[in-house]
């Protein structure tokens, strides 16, 4: 029962939809003479469609009434083809509207293009041949006949350069070109160079130089090839030799860069009398190579005095209320005859002693064999050279980076067990 009811409802909905469509079509294409026939037709039309779809479910009175108006009223069939005819009439109109401008445009295009060349050359034979199909080739012939004269103007340049025995036209061209070489573009210069057989690569200045030079075209490339063949290997080998020399220098300098620890260890041996026993153990660990020059007794005494002066300078610089300064300098032997105070105006800034990224250079000055209290990175080649040069000048040794490294001024006392307090103090702002 549910299937039958659903099928009946679907048929009723279809019939209503078809009736509505027929009413709309009737209102669009309604005529005064056929108004009566249309009023009766939309009510009776859906019944035969329903019967045609499902004759079993169609109503009994609807089936006989459906075909009767079609038989007795032939006028009912007339309004149906009329809207079709009207639709067909509209479609060709639209197609004609779309088709009409195309031939017009083609005709105008064909009318305007040919008369321009016809008026120029050979008007009579082309006018006779215009109604025929092959008017195209004479037009192309006319265009080619027009084009060769401008093409022939640059062509005389090509035969003249190969004609080397005729030097008369060449100087005139050279004079004209030298007058306007700078005005010529790069492409024109290259064309001229190609005509002369010269190389075309290079900047505009090089091209101008080649154009101005009066050497014959065949001798130049040979000379250049010889020069390149003779001179090419030398610049190629020179940088290699230079690189080898630089590498040898770097190998020679590398041991010197790693050799500073041993002389500093020797210095710790010299200063062991006035220092704690900790650096002595460190000196025993670091082997001293034979080629390292041992400092004499006089420089050792001067180094001791300078170290004491430096410690006095540090003591005077830290007269501010800080912590544990006396404890740091307890082990230091005070000199019997102290020298005048060292001026505190160091060339470098005091920030180098603070734990800033610039202090890496100062930390590298301390001997790498000694255990530094702070985890200092690898000795960096760059450092506060002004400050260190000033200290090296005081010690009488050579400046940094020249010859073998001299023993550093800094004594091993700064790396003793109580040296951590000094680093803690250096963290305070100056």
Curated annotation (Swiss-Prot):
Spans of biased composition, class Basic and acidic residues? 87-103, 207-228
Q: Could you tell me which residue ranges the SAP domain spans?
A: 181-215
Instruction: Report the subcellular localization.
Output: Nucleus
Q: Which portions of the chain have biased composition (kind: Low complexity)?
A: 363-373, 393-403
- Region named Disordered: 84-172, 204-239, 280-301, 330-416
Annotated stretches, region: Transcription activation: 224-430
Pfam families, alphabetically? SAP
A GO term (biological process) for this protein? regulation of transcription by RNA polymerase II
Provide the leader sequence positions: none
Where is this chain compositionally biased, Pro residues type? 147-170
Task: Tell me the InterPro entries matching this sequence.
Answer: SAP_dom (IPR003034), SAP_dom_sf (IPR036361), TransReg_TumorExp (IPR052305)
Gene Ontology cellular component list: nucleus
Query: Where would you say this protein principally sits, based on its record?
Result: nucleus
What PANTHER family has UniProt attached to this entry?
LYSINE-RICH CEACAM1 CO-ISOLATED PROTEIN LYRIC PROTEIN (PTHR23251), MEF2-ACTIVATING MOTIF AND SAP DOMAIN-CONTAINING TRANSCRIPTIONAL REGULATOR (PTHR23251:SF1)
Functional summary from the UniProt entry: Transcriptional coactivator. Stimulates the transcriptional activity of MEF2C. Stimulates MYOD1 activity in part via MEF2, resulting in an enhancement of skeletal muscle differentiation.
Subunit structure, interactors included:
Interacts with MEF2C.
Q: What is this protein called?
A: MEF2-activating motif and SAP domain-containing transcriptional regulator
Say which species the protein is native to: Bos taurus
């Amino acid at each position: 029962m549910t299937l039958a009811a659903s099928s009946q409802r679907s048929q009723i909905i279809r019939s209503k939809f078809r009736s509505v469509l027929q009413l709309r079509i009737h209102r669009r294409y309604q005529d005064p003479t056929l108004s009566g026939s249309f009023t009766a037709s939309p009510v009776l039309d859906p019944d035969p469609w329903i019967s045609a779809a499902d004759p079993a479910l169609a109503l009994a009175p609807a089936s006989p009434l459906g075909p009767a108006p079609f038989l007795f009223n032939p006028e009912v069939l007339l309004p149906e083809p009329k809207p079709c005819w009207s639709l067909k009439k509209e479609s060709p109109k639209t197609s004609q509207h779309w088709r009409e401008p195309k031939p017009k445009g083609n005709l105008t295009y064909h009318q305007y293009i040919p008369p321009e060349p016809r008026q120029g050359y050979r008007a009579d034979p082309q006018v006779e041949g215009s109604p025929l199909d092959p008017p195209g080739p004479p037009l192309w012939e006319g265009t080619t006949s027009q084009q060769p004269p401008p093409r022939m103007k640059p062509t005389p340049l090509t035969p003249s350069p190969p004609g080397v025995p005729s030097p008369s036209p060449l100087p005139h061209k050279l004079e004209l070109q030298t007058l306007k070489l700078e005005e010529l573009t790069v492409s024109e210069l290259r064309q001229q160079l190609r005509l002369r057989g010269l190389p075309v690569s290079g900047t505009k200045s090089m091209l101008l130089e080649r154009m101005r030079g009066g050497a014959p075209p065949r001798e130049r490339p040979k000379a250049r090839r010889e020069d390149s063949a003779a001179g090419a290997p030398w610049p190629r080998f020179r940088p290699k030799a230079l690189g080898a020399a630089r590498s040898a220098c770097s190998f020679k300098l590398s041991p010197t860069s790693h050799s500073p620890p041993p002389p500093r260890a020797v210095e710790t041996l010299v200063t062991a009398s006035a220092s704690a026993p900790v650096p002595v153990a460190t000196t025993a660990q670091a082997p001293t190579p034979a080629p390292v020059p041992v400092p004499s007794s006089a420089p050792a005494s001067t180094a001791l005095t300078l170290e004491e002066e430096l410690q006095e300078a540090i003591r005077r610089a830290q007269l501010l209320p800080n912590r544990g300064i006396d404890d740091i300098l307890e082990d230091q032997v005070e000199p019997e005859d102290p020298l005048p105070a060292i001026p505190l105006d160091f060339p470098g800034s005091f920030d180098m002693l603070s734990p800033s990224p610039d202090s890496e250079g100062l930390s590298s000055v301390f001997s790498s064999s000694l255990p530094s209290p702070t985890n200092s990175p690898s000795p960096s080649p760059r450092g506060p050279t002004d400050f260190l040069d000033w200290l090296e000048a005081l010690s009488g040794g050579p400046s940094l980076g020249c010859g073998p490294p001299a023993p550093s001024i800094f004594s091993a006392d700064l790396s003793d067990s109580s040296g951590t307090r000094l680093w803690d103090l250096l963290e305070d702002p100056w």
